[in-house]
Amino acid sequence: EILSGLVGSEMCIRDRLNEQLRVNDLTHNTSTHFIAADVRGLFGTVFNDFGSHFVCKDTNGEQPLDSMIVSVTHDEEGLVTTIDEKRHGLQDGDYVTFTEVQGMSELNGIEPRRVTVKGPYTFTIGDTRSFGEYRGGGIFKQVKMPEILNFKSLRESQQAPEFLFSDFAKIDRSMILHIGFEALSAYEEKNGHSPRPRNADDANALLALARDIMQSRNQLPEGEEATKLSNWILTELSYQATGDLSPMVAFIGGFVAQEVLKACSGKFHPLMQHMYADVLEALPKDVPNLPESEFSPQQSRYDGQIAVFGKTFQARIGNTRQFLVGSGALGCEMLKNWSMMG
C-alpha cells in the first residue's frame, strides 16, 4: 500500500536478506524499481528487479545505423545489399526502415522491418513480392525498438538466479557467492552480528549454514577441487564480513549509480539480475598465516581495512608516500581512494 502510488527506485544497501525480501515483495508489482547492493571486504554484489514489464527504450545507447543500398530482391525473403565501402553493422533482430528507394517505393517510410543478417553487406527483411521492382537508390536506417524485460522478484530469483559474470575467469564463483551472501545474512540474523575477522569458529558456522542451503537446493559442489574452492571462498567471505574498502565501494557504488540511471531513463540494458564480484587476488599471500589478533578492531576509521589486510599492512599504507601526476577526473578519484585508505 505504501509504495502502490509511487514511481521511482528503491535501494537496499547492506540490508539483511529478510529486509530485502520484505521491501522487494512491495516493489515488484508496482512501478518501483528495486536495487540491492552489498560490499564485504574484497566481495561485492548487486541485484536488480525493475518489475515484470520494464520497457528498455534503447538497449545500447548508440546512434542508429544507416547506409546506402544498391539492390533489393523481389522475393519471399527480400535480400537487401548495401554499398561495399561500408559494412551495414546490423545484427539479427534489429529493425530498419527505408527512404529514397526508387521503383520499390512501398519501402519508403514502411513500418520497421525485422532484419536477418546474411553477410557484412546483406540482410533480409521479409516478403517483398507484393512490392514494385527495385530500380535504384535508397537508404536504410536502423530503428531502435523498445524491448520488454521481465524481471523475477528477489524471492523467486534467490531460488533460480540469473547471473551477469563480472569476470569470465571466475564463472564458477557466482553461485558460491550467491549462496554465501545468503548464508552470511542468515548468520547475522541468527547471531545479531557479523562473523569476526579471521575467526575460525564463526567461519565454520557460516560454512555450515551455506552447506544447508546448498543441500536443500541440490547444489553441493562436486569433486574435491570444487569443494575446496567453495570452502575457501565462503571462509574468506566470513573473514571479511566486516571489511569495508573504499576502492570496492567505489566500484560497486559506480555500478549501482549506472543501474539507477538505466531504471529512470529506460536507456541501456540493465543488469539481469545478479552480479557478484571478488578481487581475492588482491589479498597478500601471508594473510592466511597471520594470527586473528592482527585483524581485530583498533577503534579507528580504518578498522574495515584492517579486517581484510591486517594492522601491519595498514601501518605500511599509512607510511607510504605517493606522487600522482595529473588531477583530472581519474586523478581526483585516485586521490579520494588513497586518502580514505589512509
Q: Regions from the language model: what does each represent?
A:
Residues L330-G331:
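Hydrophobic/small residue at the entry helix of a nucleotide-binding pocket
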Residues Q20-T45:
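ADP-ribose/adenylate-binding Rossmann-like module
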Residues G253-F268:
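Internal hydrophobic alpha-helix adjacent to the cofactor/substrate pocket in enzyme cavities
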Residues T59-D92, T99-I179:
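Small/polar beta-strand repeat architecture
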